[in-house]
Amino acid sequence: MNLPIVKGEYRKDYNLKHLTWFKVGGNAEIFFKPVDSEDLASFLVQNKQKLPITTFGAGSNIIIRDGGIEGVTIKLGQNFSNIGFTDDGHLIVGSSCLNFSLAKFCQVNAISGFEFLVGIPGTIGGGVAMNAGAYGCEFKDILVRIEAIDFAGNFRTFTNEEIGFKYRGNNLPKDLIILKAVFKVNKGNSEDILARMNEINAARSSTQPIKERTGGSTFANPEGFKSWQLIDKAGLRGYRIGDASISELHCNFMINNGNATAKELEDLGNFVQQKVFEDSGIKLNWEIKRIGKVSSRAWLDHGIQRKIIK
């Protein structure tokens, strides 16, 4: 495999497990951390072989399958996490900035409207991509525009309207890497903002298994329903496949109890989908992203294939 000449770092057969919150999954065939946007653009322009590209954020809302990821997995590092202000007074934030870090920056600088980010694991880029939300707010409510690059190496800008936000998603082209996000600035009171952040943290601590190996909410809420209630009603609280289980504390969270495989987690989610559909007639849609190849070894080890709703 002839890789493009870059300033950043390549690693072959790179273990991604330690980068994910679930602590499961296989290796990246090629792992690439660009130095800056120009380095990333150079890689994309030179990618004449059209090597498959996968982008990787904080690893919080993702299952990497046990067979790993083919092609090049791109992770934007600290050089893509800066926070600053535009000439017209908006916030401009690198896509690899953690949601919590932006929430804290806004609290210190008395900027309101970002408190909900303290309750959402992951990065700004990932949050924009899935229109993440919690406690009555979503990214679409605060975003002005994004700066991105497509897989051909072209820099592009999309306004809030052009992004086409929807519940836990958007209508952006699939061959796009978000580089920066620009947000509205509304002044507030630092003490009031901190109080609200503390409320959110307290609520999370009491209702979510935040100290476990988990990936956040497993399923998006169907319109008019709460996923956790449907899962609980189907009798699946605490249900277990191998070392993967449904949280006793919050039924819309899966947990790796120590040695779960990615297949066990994905099988558990698919089984929950099936049982909820049988119980209520409602299909739950995955909120956790599943990427990579299924390992043939995992199929042999697990032994059972479960029916998956199409």
UniProtKB/Swiss-Prot annotation:
Q: Which InterPro entries match?
A: FAD-bd_PCMH, FAD-bd_PCMH-like_sf, FAD-bd_PCMH_sub1, FAD-bd_PCMH_sub2, MurB, MurB_C, MurB_C_sf, Oxid_FAD_bind_N
What Enzyme Commission number(s) appear in the record? 1.3.1.98
Q: Which organism is it from?
A: Rickettsia bellii (strain OSU 85-389)
Task: Quote the catalytic activity from the record.
Answer: UDP-N-acetyl-alpha-D-muramate + NADP(+) = UDP-N-acetyl-3-O-(1-carboxyvinyl)-alpha-D-glucosamine + NADPH + H(+)
Tell me the PANTHER family matching this sequence.
UDP-N-ACETYLENOLPYRUVOYLGLUCOSAMINE REDUCTASE
State the similarity comment. Answer: Belongs to the MurB family.
Q: Which pathway features in its UniProt record?
A: Cell wall biogenesis; peptidoglycan biosynthesis
Q: Name one GO molecular function term.
A: FAD binding
Domain named FAD-binding PCMH-type: which ranges? 23-188
Q: What does this protein do?
A: Cell wall formation.
The catalytic residues are 168, 217, 287
What name does this protein carry? UDP-N-acetylenolpyruvoylglucosamine reductase
According to its UniProt entry, the protein's GO biological process terms are:
cell division; cell wall organization; peptidoglycan biosynthetic process; regulation of cell shape
Cofactor(s), names only, from the UniProt record? FAD
Keywords of the record, alphabetical order, are: Cell cycle, Cell division, Cell shape, Cell wall biogenesis/degradation, Cytoplasm, FAD, Flavoprotein, NADP, Oxidoreductase, Peptidoglycan synthesis
Q: What is its main location?
A: cytoplasm
Query: Where located?
Result: Cytoplasm
The record's section on Pfam families has: FAD_binding_4 (PF01565), MurB_C (PF02873)
Q: What cellular-component terms does GO give this entry?
A: cytosol
Q: Which gene encodes it?
A: murB
